[in-house]
């Protein structure tokens, strides 16, 4: 008997897709399509359009994969550049081992052959030489000196005493003396000196001279010629030098002459030691004739210019003059007042010259303004 198989067109049409192929027999996409990001191969058309569409995505994908490879290689290079710490060596130091071996060999050479203890050192026993041996040297040469440790049975001689420091010579290192004085004290010393020098003026007092000085300084301050007071210890020493070398007691017969001479010294001191460039002449002028004032100034400049320069350049000379001014007040206090007679001025000038001549003294001052 035969079997008849009938196929209906409807059932066959259901199992087909519009493309004309059944679903079961549809082929899976190749592996290349998955690598292309799921893009399937387009159907081949006219003039090779399918091949050109396939080539364009492959170029893009190759560029992307190249960038990924470059980034991965850069990361590897960075990781390889990291310096790994060198592990500490756990083995013994070869230099230390070599030193240990050398120490062991040295100990073996120094010690005895069979024992492990070292031999005791031989100490020479001192012997007392005979008189003949000490007096008569051997015929072969000169007498040999005894060893330093033996000393011939006698204790070693004591070491020589240390040399004492010799006293300083009179003209050697300077002697340091502290001189302390305030501005008011130096003003009184200056007044006492002028009163003793001008012995012919019986009614002159130290306060009168200080009043002349302070009057000039106050006038310059009020008129605006200076910003600060001129009366300081250093300036008082300068004024004392000028007064000591210019004032003559036998030539000054009145207080007016003394005031004119003293104000001339003040004018030179202000011009030389003051902070301003120039000062007015009116506070320093008490006489109607200006020519006499300028003549006194020129005589003092020609005669005392080296000493004025030295007072600023040589600290030893300055301290000597400072001490002389301080001594003027002490002399007045010891005598009880300004002495009379020409012997006082002669003694004062001679003591000042003697104090300036002694160059070995160095005076250290504390100036209290």
From Swiss-Prot:
Comp. bias regions, Low complexity: 122-144, 331-352
Region Disordered, residue ranges: 1-55, 72-176, 330-369
Modified residues (Phosphothreonine): 84
Highest taxon listed in the record's lineage: Eukaryota
Record Pfam families: CDK5_activator
Lipid attachment residues per UniProt (N-myristoyl glycine): 2
Subunit record text: Heterodimer of a catalytic subunit and a regulatory subunit.
Protein name per Swiss-Prot or TrEMBL: Cyclin-dependent kinase 5 activator 2
Native species: Mus musculus (Mouse)
UniProt biased composition (Pro residues): 145-171
Composition-biased stretches (Basic and acidic residues): 99-112
Family classification: Belongs to the cyclin-dependent kinase 5 activator family.
UniProt-listed SUPFAM superfamilies: Cyclin-like
Biased composition, class Polar residues, residue ranges: 1-11
InterPro entries according to UniProt: CDK5_activator (IPR004944), Cyclin-like_sf (IPR036915)
PANTHER family, A to Z: CYCLIN DEPENDANT KINASE-5 ACTIVATOR, CYCLIN-DEPENDENT KINASE 5 ACTIVATOR 2
GO cellular component: cytoplasm; plasma membrane; presynapse; protein kinase 5 complex
Compositional bias ranges of the Basic residues kind: 74-84
Post-translational note: Myristoylated. The Gly-2-Ala mutant is absent of the cell periphery, suggesting that a proper myristoylation signal is essential for the proper distribution of CDK5R2 (p39).
Record-level GO BP terms: cerebellum development; hippocampus development; layer formation in cerebral cortex; neuron migration; positive regulation of calcium ion-dependent exocytosis; regulation of cytoskeleton organization; superior olivary nucleus maturation
Gene assigned in the entry: Cdk5r2
